[in-house]
C-alpha cells in the first residue's frame, strides 16, 4: 500500500487525506485508475477555488500534463470519489480516453483522444441544446452508440455511422413520455445585485390550475452540486 499524500508531496496544501477541517476546504480526491493502474485520475482544488481534473503518474509521483479546469465551476464532486462513471474507458485501447463533466452550458465529455473529440463536436453541432453522450464504439471507430436527450425530452439511443454521418434511432427512453404530456423546461441565468452570475432551470406547467402559476424554488444539494440543462424525470 502507498499513501497518496506521501507519494505526491506537491499536493500537501490540498491533501488526499480527508478530515472534517478540509472537507469544505482544500483537498484532493481520486476518481479512478487507468487500465495499467499506473495512472490515477483525481480532482483537486489546490491553488484554485474550484475542482479541476488531473492525472498522476504513480511510478514517478508526478502529475502529467492533463489539466481540465474551469474558473467558476467544480468539474467534480467530492462526494463522488472513486465513482468511475465519470471516466470513459476505451475497451479496445484499454485506457481512459475522456471525462464526463457538467460544462458551463450543457453536460459534455472532455476527450483526451482527438478523434473522439472530433466526433463529439460533430454530434453536438448537429444536435444543439441536447446532451450528447458517446457510450461505445467499434474497433475501427466507424459505428458509435450514442445517447441524445433534450431540454424536455428523455431522449433516445442511436447508432452514429461516422462515414455516412448519419444517426439512426434504435430505442426511445421512456416512450410513454410524449411531448403532449411533458412540461417545458428551459435554462436561465442572470446577474444578481451582488454581481454574481446565478443560473438554473425553470419548468413551465403545461396546464396550470392557477394563472399565473405560483413559483416554487428548489435549491440543489450543496455545496458543489448544481443544476444543469437536460431532461429531469
Locate predicted features.
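Peripheral, non-catalytic segments that deliver or gate enzyme domains
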Residues: 1-199, 203-212, 223-233
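Structural cue for short, hydrophobic secondary-structure segments
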Residues: 218-221
